[in-house]
Amino acid sequence: METVQLRNNPRRHLKKLSEESLNKQPEEVFDVLEKLGEGSYGSVYKASHKETSQIVAIKQIPVESDLQEIIKEISIMQQCDSPHVVKYYGSYFKNTDLWIVMEFCGGGSVSDIIRLRKQTLNEDEIATILQSTLKGLEYLHFMRKIHRDIKAGNILLSCEGTAKLADFGVAGQLTDTMAKRNTVIGTPFWMAPEVIQEIGYNCVADIWSLGITAIEMAEGKPPYAEIHPMRAIFMIPSNPPPTFRKPELWSKDFVDFINLCLVKNPELRSSATELLQHPFIKAAKGESILRHLLNAAQDEKLKRTELKQREVEPEEKENVNEDEVDVGTMVQAGGKDLNTMKELGMMSEGADGTMVEKDKLETQMGTMLINDEDEEEETGTMKQCTEPAQQAKPSFLEYFEQKENQFGTPEKTSPTSTDPSEWKIPLNGDYSFLKDWSVAEVQLKLNSLDPMMEREIEEIHHKYQAKRQPILEAIESKKRRQQNF
């Protein structure tokens, strides 16, 4: 089995590509073994470093991709040197592609392991993964970096069971100790309330996401996963902090850990350093307890791969790498992702890119990434809002509005039967008229209700924003006067 081979490999480890290696063609330095999947911005491959025989992950990115985001990801990885953060080895330009060489994590992502085993994790397994993840976050936060997309799909496991943070496609850096960001960025169900509200946030936004991730590992999905992401975006800031569906099934220490992560006021939320001293984390067992998870997931992956190969005709076998889902969570061709701004979702096999599985739930769990045109949030300073109140519209609302315009509402078949705004709810509650409609007409009416609901929610939000904006401006004005004194 591959995990055993990697553990027993006596060769020396690759730390960084030499100048000589970087001046060669990548094919002279690496043997590309197989395609792992489609990641954020490009394809991810498993490869072997010829000199050391070390397995690495190579992300191949077309140069027409969003180079600004790619350069940001490389910059973040270059600056990091932690056993709990995926390592960066070097980059190449090959024809029209940029090759990014990074650490390969043979265990895959935590979400992949849950999916392959069709089983959630127990408390001992969760505590061990959280301990390593918190060490990675402690390191990033000490370096004044915010990950901004913590979830099970972005936590990778090495063959030994070490958890590592990956996918820095949306990571950002704080350039001032008091700086806070105010861009909606991350994955909707894992977003901290202050991120959604765009009131500025700092490193503890990652701690909220970690609490949601802990629930995800325990229950298989994050809170609000069953509902539309837009509804979740309104519910997360207004509702009490989420918790387990059945808290009585979990230990008091685990429930307390979740409660400390999911404090709505970021000023009162615990830091990664503080949480590493929590009893639930301090009681974590060694990484060896995760090996059975890795072996079980690897066995299941091999079974599925063999089954897939038996089903494929000989002339189609060359396409297995592109069609195979179980070597990682793969991007679905022509996917139906209507709810994500920039799909950076699930990672696989140590590839520091994002893999998206094609099940229904994952289509709603991609990463929402909204940046200002001039990227001024990268200065680390909070942006002042100077626009009139009636023009204020959170970025995520603009995004969903664009999606609605893109996919449109059902076309009219009659002047009165399909436009939801023209359909008045019967005051007497009598819906017997529906019996005279065809199935197609009823289905069309049903399909038209969601856009109608979203428009009404947006109108309500505009009214709220119109009341909220003068208060925010008054607070900002008072702060400026205090600074002048």
UniProtKB/Swiss-Prot annotation:
Function noted in UniProt: Stress-activated, pro-apoptotic kinase which, following caspase-cleavage, enters the nucleus and induces chromatin condensation followed by internucleosomal DNA fragmentation. Key component of the Hippo signaling pathway which plays a pivotal role in organ size control and tumor suppression by restricting proliferation and promoting apoptosis.
Residue ranges annotated for the Protein kinase domain, each copy included: 30-281
Assigned protein family: Belongs to the protein kinase superfamily. STE Ser/Thr protein kinase family. STE20 subfamily.
Superkingdom as given in the UniProt entry: Eukaryota
GO cellular component: cytoplasm; nucleus
Chain positions with Phosphothreonine modification: 183
Organism: Xenopus laevis
Residues carrying the site annotation Cleavage: 326-327
Description of how the protein assembles with itself and partners: Homodimer; mediated via the coiled-coil region.
SUPFAM superfamilies: Protein kinase-like (PK-like)
InterPro entries per record: Kinase-like_dom_sf, Mst1_2_SARAH_domain, p53_tetramer_sf, Prot_kinase_dom, Protein_kinase_ATP_BS, SARAH_dom, STE20/SPS1-PAK
Catalytic activity of the protein: L-seryl-[protein] + ATP = O-phospho-L-seryl-[protein] + ADP + H(+); L-threonyl-[protein] + ATP = O-phospho-L-threonyl-[protein] + ADP + H(+)
EC number(s) reported in the record: 2.7.11.1
Domain SARAH: 431-478
Subcellular location(s) of the protein: Cytoplasm; Nucleus
UniProt cross-references to Pfam families, sorted A to Z: Mst1_SARAH, Pkinase
Active-site residue list: 149 (proton acceptor)
Cofactor (UniProt): Mg(2+)
Predominant cellular place of this UniProt entry's protein: cytoplasm
Keyword tags: Apoptosis, ATP-binding, Coiled coil, Cytoplasm, Kinase, Magnesium, Metal-binding, Nucleotide-binding, Nucleus, Phosphoprotein, Serine/threonine-protein kinase, Transferase
Protein's name according to its UniProt entry: Serine/threonine-protein kinase 4
PANTHER family, sorted: STERILE20-LIKE KINASE, ISOFORM B, STERILE20-LIKE KINASE, ISOFORM B-RELATED
Gene Ontology terms describing biological process: apoptotic process; hippo signaling; intracellular signal transduction; negative regulation of canonical Wnt signaling pathway; positive regulation of apoptotic process; protein tetramerization; regulation of MAPK cascade
Activity modulation: The C-terminal non-catalytic region inhibits the kinase activity, the enzyme is activated by caspase-cleavage. Homodimerization and autophosphorylation of Thr-183 is also required for full activation.
Residues the entry annotates as binding ATP: 36-44, 59
